[in-house]
């Protein structure tokens, strides 16, 4: 049997995607719409306390295209906290006019493919802790997509010897390092949590960098032979002070 890679796991992750029911929302009286927006602002401000106490974080983006209008991404120490957040959000008045289009449940993950041998507790390493329990950037743009490692009769990632997988992931990682300073990447593991095996969330102030890195990685053997992808979601940051303009009709 092929050897499984060990993982380090951090905060639990929930991506929520919604479309706005503009047809119905425009029928609501202006005062009621404003009250809904104020309630949403209060909800988001309340969730920002977790960032300040380093007990989680969140990001909100306006999705481009017809797959969704909004992305809300939450990180928390325990899965049940994500349930509480989702339940609380669904009880907001404005949620009556938001149509769920997609969601993704996962956990911030680092694999040991590129790790060197050490007796150190990795969870005490400041660099590792910063990646497992991150402070999300407030970049202009976001890109999210789920992915699997291919497993069929011709190419089966999980049947490769671990040394071969380490080599492939090293070469794969070298491409990503070329985009340091341009893209911030977060990998979340979802085996047993959702329909794909990983979620990839990218942040950048230059949206074109998403196209460049994904295209370049298409030529990497790890992706070309073993990568399978779901839908891609691209969005622009939606700050709390932008809510009124976004929901105005």
Swiss-Prot record:
Coiled coil: none
Catalytic residue positions: 145
Positions that bind Fe-coproporphyrin III: 131, 145-149, 172, 185
Reaction(s) the record says it catalyses: Fe-coproporphyrin III + 2 H2O2 + 2 H(+) = heme b + 2 CO2 + 4 H2O; Fe-coproporphyrin III + H2O2 + H(+) = harderoheme III + CO2 + 2 H2O; harderoheme III + H2O2 + H(+) = heme b + CO2 + 2 H2O
Cofactor(s), by name: Fe-coproporphyrin III
Alphabetically ordered keywords of this record: Heme, Heme biosynthesis, Iron, Metal-binding, Oxidoreductase
Keyword Heme annotated: yes
Molecular function via GO: heme binding; metal ion binding; oxidoreductase activity, acting on the CH-CH group of donors, oxygen as acceptor; peroxidase activity
GO biological process: heme B biosynthetic process
Cofactor note: Fe-coproporphyrin III acts both as a substrate and a redox cofactor.
Family according to the record: Belongs to the ChdC family. Type 1 subfamily.
General function of this protein: Involved in coproporphyrin-dependent heme b biosynthesis. Catalyzes the decarboxylation of Fe-coproporphyrin III (coproheme) to heme b (protoheme IX), the last step of the pathway. The reaction occurs in a stepwise manner with a three-propionate intermediate.
Protein name stated in the entry: Coproheme decarboxylase
Naturally occurring in which organism (per UniProt): Staphylococcus epidermidis (strain ATCC 35984 / DSM 28319 / BCRC 17069 / CCUG 31568 / BM 3577 / RP62A)
Lineage of the species this protein comes from: Bacteria, Bacillati, Bacillota, Bacilli, Bacillales
Underlying gene: chdC
């Amino acid at each position: 049997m092929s050897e499984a890679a060990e993982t380090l796991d951090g905060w639990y992750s929930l991506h929520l995607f919604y479309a706005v029911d503009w047809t119905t929302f425009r029928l609501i009286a202006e005062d009621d719409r404003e009250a809904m927006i104020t309630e949403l602002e209060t909800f988001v401000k309340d969730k920002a306390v977790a960032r300040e106490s380093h007990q989680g974080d969140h990001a909100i983006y306006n999705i481009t295209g017809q797959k969704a209008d909004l992305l809300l991404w939450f990180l928390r120490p325990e899965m049940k906290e994500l349930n509480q957040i989702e339940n609380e959000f669904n009880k907001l008045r404005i949620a009556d006019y938001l149509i769920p289009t997609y969601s993704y449940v996962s956990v911030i993950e680092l694999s040991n493919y590129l790790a060197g041998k050490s007796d150190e507790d990795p969870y005490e390493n400041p660099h590792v802790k910063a990646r497992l329990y991150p402070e999300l950037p407030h970049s202009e743009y976001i890109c999210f997509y789920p992915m699997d490692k291919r497993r069929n009769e011709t190419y089966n990632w999980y049947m490769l010897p671990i040394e071969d997988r380490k080599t492939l992931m090293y070469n794969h990682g070298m491409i990503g390092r070329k985009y340091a300073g341009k893209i911030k990447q977060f990998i979340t593991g979802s085996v047993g949590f959702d329909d794909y095996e990983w979620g990839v969330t990218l942040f950048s102030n230059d949206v074109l960098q998403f196209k460049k890195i994904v295209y370049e990685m298409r030529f990497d053997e790890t992706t070309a032979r073993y990568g399978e992808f779901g839908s891609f979601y691209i969005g622009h940051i939606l700050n709390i002070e932008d809510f009124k303009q976004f929901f105005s009709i």
